[in-house]
């Protein structure tokens, strides 16, 4: 129990610094504080006696509410008040009114940290209670987090109570002067509801308090306010306490009269104060604690003594919660889902069936794919087995050939090829072409015609049959054949289906019976005949004309053209091996590089196989003797000329290659001295280089030839027309001069030379086109007319066919130049400088194929444009370092070409020069020739590399020494990456010699001469 004195009210009121913002009786200080001056007004009213009349009306009409008390609010000075302390009036220990702070409803306990509240009894202590509550509300809002851990509600501190109150005593009630101070506190307590509204939120448990407060209004006449039981604690006040006002001694007139109205007003104001405390804020989301219990009415207690009982309520006991498990049973029938489930199950079954169908379909597709893969694997295995069989066949043929050469008995076989169409069997429409194959050099008058049937085709065996010449016909040399009679012609026509079958299979891929190199790059004389074949079965089929049963041709041995078919299959094997090698290089470059190593066993096997094939092909192609024209019967005048042999095949280039510097070359200690030859592709101006020390079969690759597919077909038609115009040349084609028998007479040799001249003569179509161009081109200067374009196209096709092939004949080129020269000098210049779709001229092709005899003929005309660039930007001079000049005559042509052309022209593809190309391909002789012809050693390509950098990059010390000997060589040039020639070789220990050469050259005041470079 603590007693509170009213003297400390002024000090407690000074702690509130916030002035009422809308209070009419206040003064603002210079520091922004407001001083409340209402107490002066109340003092005047008390002195004038207007307290009872004006207080309820004035305060009830204003209805002003404040959220907080003014900061500078203070009670009237204690000196202005007089307290009458009636002696011997104390609270009875039996009837103390204990008002609990922070009481709560039993069903809704107050959470930890809520504001503790206390009630003070008496009209003078109501203001002090409100001030403390407002202050504690602000402190609780600021420190709500700090109060969460406390286990009991926060109570009023003893330090917040007035210091002048004595324990176990009640402050004395003022007699007269305490009335104004009590009236001063009542209007402020009406606004206490606003403080509660801002601090607390509505709760469901507080609705009973509002109902109780409303019942107070109905019972004001009886002076018995209805207070809920949840708020009050302790016993009800006794009846004697309600009459405590009679014990007050109040000086002044009519004190007894004023006591009752004051009590009524105070009771009414207390009711409004409690009603304001019970007002709930509807907009808040959090429940507010129950309101503070209203203080005991003044007429219930004595006005002389008011006792404040502060009790501490322990926290409510924890609520026991019973947990029960409730099971709810829901059936499908009650929910009405039975039909829906049935339909959903059926739909799911349908989906499962559809998925099973898809799965089965995919399984079938997978099975088909697997079967296709297995079939492809089987086909691949079959191809590999076929290749192995072909290799075995080649080995068997080589062994057989060696045995035949080693045999002492001479053996000679004549093979005949019938060129008649299959449907024409009359003797007039038949023509025999005889090719004698001399397998041994020793002639023998005996001719044996072995024949056997195997797999439906004639198969040549080692058994021989003796045949005797007819007495009516003279005996001719063994390699020649006699004319046949009608019976033999008919027999050969009947058997010509065999040869026609081969031609049907190889239509479009046969080659002209002219000069063509073998797979090993072996050059043969002009007129040599060869064939190209398609892929065939491992069993070699040989075709020849056969005789009717019982019909004999005396003196005429017959056999299949063994050399032709074997040569075809040998070439096909070479092509397959070359294709296999290309696939290996593209698909497995690491394996291909390993095979290329000289120490590799696979490399040696590959080289041996290719060399064996080359020897076999050259042996068969070199043994085809040329039959004399006079021995071949001329067809009757009415007989149409026989169809010419097909022109040589021009395989389209499989890939476009360029003579740009190598991207994948590595460092080497020095040049390998290998002669490299440029193979011209001729479609987009690209080139490829081959080495004579690499696989010898590369020279006969499909990329060796220069014309495109369109030109190939046109050349075939032109060659057939040319052969039709010169049927007498058929017998002399395709046979080298060196294979003729030494026993031939001189007049026979003259006829052969005459036939050669006739062979190289341009066609009539070519001559007519030249005449047309010579008449119109000088006048018009263009080729817009259809006739002129056709003529130019004809000339272009035949000219490139004659001059631009790898095995073109210089005699043929000379014959064409001689035929064109008389027409017009302009036409000669047009013909020599004629370019194809890729911008390549005959000079480009001739240099790329190392046909320096044709190059010399073109240069001797005096109208050849040496500096003509193709679409890739290369001139004939630029590709000269890639050609192979093996003789002094060839080197003389090279020097002439370099002197007439510009050696410093750069290609448009990469900016390379002829010197860079020579260095990139390790052509030391060509580099020396270019330097002698004023080639600029310091030119740089598009990457900034010079010839010296390329030589250092390849590690060729000889070329580096040769370039540094040039007085204009600059070794400090840098490429676009900022590298010099020295920096390129410093990282490799194998180039110490080159690094020393570069350092010696870069020293100031020292220049290495050729002799010093030779010593180093």
From Swiss-Prot:
Any one GO BP annotation for this protein: negative regulation of actin filament polymerization
Subcellular location: Cytoplasm
Keyword hit for Phosphoprotein: yes
Gene3D superfamilies: Ankyrin repeat-containing domain (1.25.40.20)
Annotated Acidic residues bias: 695-708
Listed GO CC annotations: cytoplasm; cytosol; microtubule cytoskeleton
Cysteine pairings via disulfide bonds: none
Keyword Phosphoprotein applies: yes
Keywords: ANK repeat, Coiled coil, Cytoplasm, Phosphoprotein, Repeat
Positions in coiled-coil regions: 346-409
Chain intervals with Basic and acidic residues compositional bias: 401-414, 445-454, 709-727, 745-755
Residues with the Phosphothreonine modification: 639
Ranges of biased composition (kind: Polar residues): 70-80, 246-258, 460-469
A UniProt-annotated Pfam family: KN_motif
Record's compositionally biased regions (Pro residues): 632-650
Region of interest: Disordered: 1-26, 70-91, 235-259, 401-485, 506-563, 622-755
Positions of ANK repeats: 838-868, 877-905, 910-939, 943-973, 977-1007
Function: May be involved in the control of cytoskeleton formation by regulating actin polymerization.
Protein name listed in UniProt: KN motif and ankyrin repeat domain-containing protein 4
Organism encoding this protein: Mus musculus
Lineage: Eukaryota, Metazoa, Chordata, Craniata, Vertebrata
Gene coding for it: Kank4
